[in-house]
Amino acid sequence: MKITYKINIYNLLTYLLVFAIIKPYFLPAGLRQASKIIILISVFLFTISREKKERIVNLSWLFSGCVLLSAVMAYLKGGYHDKDFLDALLYVVTFYDIYSFIGLCKQKDRFNETIKCLYNIVGLYCVLTFVSILLVGTVNNSNQSAYIFGNKFTSSYLFIFFVALYGASHEMILWKNKICYIALFISSIALTLYIGCATATVTLAVLFIATIVPFQK
């Protein structure tokens, strides 16, 4: 009996885009950079090949253009080395890719599926991060490669992203989802307190308060 698997290109590119942005630090630096470049170019080409011509130039160009202009000026004045300038270019492409690819998914009625894909991959990242925190502890966790996906700041922000994605991908009118949502908030706050990331703790606390306090018009 032959078993076939269908891989949706939008889902695949969503997973790859997250991998390009949040790379595991156990990989060699050269491999991380090369994979990021390949993925960003692939997402860029895929997006502009399927996007309407009038939508290729969008609002993301405003921010990306400012970053690119400042990078060029810094490079010409000697403030940036070649690596710094390359990082700035990749940042520009990353911002454009995220904005334009999500917009394309919205047009193709794939936005909810994209959110679910983001929830799944970020959830996996959080599980791996939690394991690495248990193994490494909190000593010198400001170091960029302290945990599997970066230092205490990057690791904490992953959990903020995950909590937000849970709220976006689940129906909050259901009590079981509300309970899980609150549990995620509490556990994430506890984790950020443990590894000493005050900014993430405050952010999660504010989001939690905003979630439980009813909005008054």
What is each residue range found by the language model?
Residues 1-217:
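Hydrophobic transmembrane helix bundles of membrane-integrated enzymes that assemble
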